[in-house]
From Swiss-Prot:
Its main location: plastid. Signal peptide: none annotated. It is found in: Plastid, Chloroplast thylakoid membrane. [4Fe-4S] cluster 1 binds at C64, C67, C70, C114. NDH shuttles electrons from NAD(P)H:plastoquinone, via FMN and iron-sulfur (Fe-S) centers, to quinones in the photosynthetic chain and possibly in a chloroplast respiratory chain. The immediate electron acceptor for the enzyme in this species is believed to be plastoquinone. Couples the redox reaction to proton translocation, and thus conserves the redox energy in a proton gradient. This is NAD(P)H-quinone oxidoreductase subunit I, chloroplastic. Residues 55-84, 95-124 form the 4Fe-4S ferredoxin-type domain. PROSITE patterns: 4FE4S_FER_1, 4FE4S_FER_2. GO terms for cellular component: chloroplast thylakoid membrane. It comes from Gossypium hirsutum (Upland cotton). The keyword NAD applies. It is a peripheral membrane protein. Keywords: 4Fe-4S, Chloroplast, Iron, Iron-sulfur, Membrane, Metal-binding, NAD, NADP, Plastid, Plastoquinone, Quinone, Repeat, Thylakoid, Translocase. Its cofactor is [4Fe-4S] cluster. The gene is ndhI.
């Protein structure tokens, strides 16, 4: 009879412990109910990129001296630089410059080592297309500056929505 009583006591302790664990889990669940949602509605709300965000590369044709430093420092030799040597002025003349963003790893080496600062990183990260050949940008496409997420009036940024909720 004595082992039977201790068995009932152990069962009671285990039941109380299980109820305590369930209660703790329920309290954690209730504490999350007061928090703001973490997910964003992507096409309508966008995160503001950080200052050093490495997005699409912007290229300024007039500044480029066709030195090909960007090609040498690129880990995958990606930028295609076509130039012609002008004998009368004894300098290279840039003919064509292109980058295939389907292959680019956005490391930023080309921007960092460019001696004339003709390359820069933008905050544009929406490069999806239906055809991968559309990701090959020439100097004209690389020269276009993207619209800033902050300046776009059709998009509510997460920073603005948080400021509205706190007011």
């Amino acid at each position: 009879m004595f082992p039977m009583v201790t068995g009932f006591m152990n069962y009671g302790h285990q039941t109380v412990r299980a109820a305590r664990y369930i209660g703790q889990g329920f309290m954690i669940t209730l504490s999350h109910a007061n928090r703001l949602p973490v997910t964003i509605q992507y096409p309508y709300e966008k995160l503001i990129t950080s200052e050093r965000f490495r997005g699409r590369i912007h290229f300024e044709f007039d500044k480029c001296i066709a030195c090909e430093v960007c090609v040498r420092v690129c880990p995958i030799d990606l930028p295609v630089v076509d130039w012609k040597f002008e004998t009368d002025i004894r300098k290279k003349r840039l003919l064509n410059y292109s980058i295939d963003f389907g292959i680019c790893i956005f490391c930023g080496n080309c921007v960092e080592y460019c001696p004339t600062n003709c390359l820069s990183m933008t905050e544009e990260y929406e490069l999806s297309t239906y055809d991968r050949h559309e990701l090959n940008y020439n100097q004209i496409a690389l020269g276009r500056l993207p619209m800033s997420v902050i300046d776009d009036y059709t998009i509510r940024t997460v920073l603005n929505s948080i400021q509205r909720k706190t007011q």
